């Protein structure tokens, strides 16, 4: 191979489309069929359940781009200043038997006009050309999911066939265009005149390139995962202006609110306790007990399912755990750790964040700093109190007590002949032996008292009398926290001197003589 040929092979320049197809992890996530525990919709139970399934993250992401686009259009219509606008009243998703996926929604259609600078029809520009978007103005505060100009174009690049339809009622035009062969073929659009009284809509169709994904089509579990996203969108779409109906395969998704959506996971309020709070139109959240005693989160940012969580989850959970720690310490006089609380909880969060940032194009972890959320949310004291009374407080106290008992066990004494490592302690010669019951431990105050006692002891007294000098008033352990007792040096010294064990009850003199190093 010539040096020129070697250099040509070593240094290559690819088109954007080829780079996307060759490096899917960067744009849509893995295209491998992986095993994972995912929340999916189960038709049999009509619930959202966690199940170990085979699914392809990249294929899931293509679907997600489409359904988030539809939800974004709801928000755009609500926020749009234009006068002749139509609010979105429906979002429909269809997954056909051959694997073709269709999204449709009403609301204003796409502007059917040629771009004055690029001389390309605007629908083709935003669907068929990379790095084109209406979301590039950094000064505009948006609470939509789209951001960087890839979006649904990724779905068309990873598809064998695509089609867009849109009706622009303000111009009285309908636009239809087809795309083939991973967006390598863009057919000329068909544009027809329609009455300006026509109802605007947009419909996008794509058939993923299943051969590139290494599968013949969509599995039942994969369809359940996609259907679950339709339920998500029903739960997190703003209904403040107009009720939006969400459909999946011609069936109306029966989710009326975020609270109703939580029922799909944990059952009705009579089945499972949960606490819900909504501070404003941008924040709502609910807490239930985690089914497997492991922290679980279900969260959404601008309609995007952040199944790995993010700063928004930390923001709410840090408030809840901190306030619960303070509440429990005030009520129970027990210092519990945030972990002992968090591991009990399942949290559901829906929020709208201005211009959110994510750790990758897959958008499963939101990393926008709290200061840039564009809104704030303070978890109320009443909400925290209700969570505590769900049983969280009692369990946290029990976990803390068990942990402290385990730590306290490390300071336990035992009935041994010798005790070492205790400063200024004078042990009785016969303590820890068969004659322990005859031994007496004297607790005195300070070294001067120790010297006085020692000077008055005979050699025979030294066989049965031990002395330990205290440094002042001894901690009163009655009702005291286990941790505070375990951290007290004098108490732990006395435990070792006597042979006391945490949690052991000495009910009579027989127990004392049998287990302890001193009888009195």
Positions of the model-derived regions?
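GHKL-family ATPase ATP-binding module
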Residues: 1-13, 17, 23, 31-52, ...
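Short glycine-rich substrate-engagement loop in P-loop NTPases that contacts/grips substrate
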Residues: 20, 489-503
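Activation loop
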Residues: 16, 122-126, 490, 494
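ABC-family P-loop ATPase nucleotide-binding domains
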Residues: 28
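Short conserved segment of the HATPase_c
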Residues: 21, 112-132
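Short, conserved glycine- and acidic-residue-centered signature motifs
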Residues: 119, 148, 487
């Amino acid at each position: 191979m010539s040096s020129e040929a070697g250099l040509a092979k070593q240094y290559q320049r690819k088109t954007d489309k080829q780079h996307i197809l060759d490096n899917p992890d960067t744009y849509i996530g893995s295209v491998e069929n992986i095993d994972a525990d995912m929340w999916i919709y189960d038709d049999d139970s009509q619930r959202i359940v966690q199940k170990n399934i085979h699914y392809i993250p990249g294929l899931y992401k293509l679907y997600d781009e489409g359904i988030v686009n539809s939800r974004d259009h709801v928000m755009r219509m609500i926020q749009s200043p234009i006068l002749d606008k139509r609010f979105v009243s429906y979002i429909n998703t269809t997954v056909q038997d051959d694997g073709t996926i269709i999204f449709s929604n009403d609301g204003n259609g796409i502007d059917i006009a040629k771009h004055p600078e690029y001389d390309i029809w605007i629908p083709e520009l935003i669907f068929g050309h990379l790095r084109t978007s209406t979301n590039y103005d950094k000064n505009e505060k948006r609470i939509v999911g789209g951001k960087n100009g890839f979006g649904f174009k990724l779905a068309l690049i990873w598809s064998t066939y695509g089609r867009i339809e849109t009706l622009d009622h303000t111009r009285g035009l309908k636009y239809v265009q087809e795309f083939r062969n991973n967006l390598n073929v863009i057919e000329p659009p068909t544009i027809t005149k329609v009455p300006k009284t026509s109802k605007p809509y947009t419909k996008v169709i794509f058939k993923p390139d299943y051969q590139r994904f290494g599968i013949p089509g969509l599995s039942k579990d994969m369809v359940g995962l996609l259907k679950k996203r339709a339920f998500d969108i029903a739960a997190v779409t703003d209904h403040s202006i107009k009720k939006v109906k969400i459909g999946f395969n011609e069936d109306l998704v029966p989710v009326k609110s975020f609270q109703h959506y939580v029922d799909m996971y944990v059952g009705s309020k009579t089945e499972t306790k949960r606490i819900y709070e909504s501070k404003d139109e941008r924040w709502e959240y609910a807490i239930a007990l985690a089914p497997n005693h492991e922290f679980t989160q279900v969260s959404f940012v601008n309609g995007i399912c952040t199944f790995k969580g993010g700063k928004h989850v930390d923001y709410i959970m840090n408030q809840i755990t901190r306030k619960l720690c303070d509440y429990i310490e005030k009520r129970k006089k027990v210092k519990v750790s945030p972990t002992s609380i968090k591991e009990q909880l399942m949290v559901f969060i829906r929020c709208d964040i201005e211009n959110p940032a994510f750790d990758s194009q897959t958008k499963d972890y939101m990393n926008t700093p709290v200061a840039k959320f564009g809104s704030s949310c303070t978890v109320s004291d009443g909400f925290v109190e209700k969570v505590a009374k769900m049983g969280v407080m009692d369990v946290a106290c029990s976990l803390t007590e068990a942990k402290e008992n385990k730590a306290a066990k490390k300071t336990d004494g035992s009935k041994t002949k010798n005790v070492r490592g205790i400063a200024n302690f004078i042990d009785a010669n016969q303590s820890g032996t068969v004659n322990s019951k005859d031994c007496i431990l004297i607790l005195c105050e300070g070294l001067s008292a120790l010297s006085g006692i020692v000077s008055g002891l005979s050699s025979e007294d030294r066989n049965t009398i031990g002395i330990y000098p205290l440094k002042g008033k001894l901690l009163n352990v009655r009702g005291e926290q286990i941790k505070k007792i375990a951290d007290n040096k004098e108490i732990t010294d006395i435990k070792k001197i006597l042979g006391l064990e945490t949690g052991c009850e000495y009910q009579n003199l027989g127990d004392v003589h049998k287990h302890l190093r001193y009888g009195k």
